[in-house]
A protein has these predicted regions:
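Amphipathic alpha-helical packing segments from all-alpha helical-bundle domains
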Residues: 117-160, 168, 179-182
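Amphipathic alpha-helical segments used for helix-helix packing
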Residues: 90-126, 168
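Hydrophobic alpha-helical connector segments
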Residues: 63, 77-104, 159
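An amphipathic alpha-helix adjacent to DNA-recognition modules
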Residues: 12-20, 32-33, 53-77, 81
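Basic, helix-initiating cap at the start of DNA-binding domains
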Residues: 1-29, 38, 42
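Hydrophobic/aromatic residues within well-ordered alpha-helical segments
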Residues: 14, 57, 64, 68-72, ...
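Short hydrophobic/aromatic patch on the recognition helix
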Residues: 44-54
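C-terminal peripheral helix-coil segments that are non-catalytic and often amphipathic
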Residues: 1, 141-145, 161, 165-199
Length: 199
């Protein structure tokens, strides 16, 4: 029996189906216990079809992260609704969404998982301040009231601290977690928005 040939549209639809079902498996099992077989079965395909799209489970998760990035930018465009800029309140929602999004892959990864992903990534998941600055500049270009003197390194680090806090929530005092997050977001907003406009 010859292998099924997919059109470009079918390939994209199938990949999206695998990403969405794989994300749910990641939430349920974590990366360690999420197998290629489980991903294939949940998407209604065979393992050999999965292997035509991805080199490994790690490759799948790296591409899932890229897929989520595309969904994030689409969500920003949807919020804009044809406008040039988001209000400060909407901009704060976007920054909060980066951290508190239930579909963020990072919160379901362990440090060991992240090491495996770094090893599987072509660039070793190297931190690149120029690339991060470009991404933040692009994002802040859609925000009203952004400071003229944004320190992109500090903002990037604050976003990482917020992400690490969310990922390691279990080692923090649960009763103070929301208040801690509020304080950290307050600091972040103060670094992004002009004085008097970050309320």
């Amino acid at each position: 029996m010859s292998p099924k040939l997919f059109s470009i549209t079918e390939k994209e639809q199938l990949k999206e189906k695998m990403f969405l079902s794989g994300l749910e498996l990641l939430k349920e099992y974590g990366m360690t216990h999420m197998s290629v077989e489980k991903i294939a079965a949940s998407a209604g395909i065979g393992k050999s079809t999965f292997d035509n799209f991805f080199m490994s489970k790690e490759d799948f998760v790296l591409q899932l992260i890229g897929f989520n990035r595309m969904r994030f930018w689409k969500a920003v465009q949807d919020m804009l609704g044809g406008r040039e800029k988001l209000t400060i309140a909407e901009s704060k929602q976007v920054l909060t969404m980066i951290i508190n999004n239930k579909d963020s892959v990072y919160q379901y990864l362990t440090p060991e998982n992240e090491e495996k992903l770094a090893a599987a990534s072509p660039d070793g998941n190297k931190l690149d301040i120029d690339e991060e600055t470009d991404t933040l500049r692009r994002l802040f270009g859609y925000f009203e009231g952004v400071r003229g003197d944004v320190d992109f390194g500090v903002v990037s680090n604050l976003l990482k601290i917020l992400a690490l806090t969310a990922e390691n929530k279990t080692i923090l005092h649960e009763s103070a977690y929301d208040r801690t997050q509020e304080k950290l977001f307050g600091l972040l907003f103060g670094c992004v928005f002009k004085e008097g406009e970050n309320e």
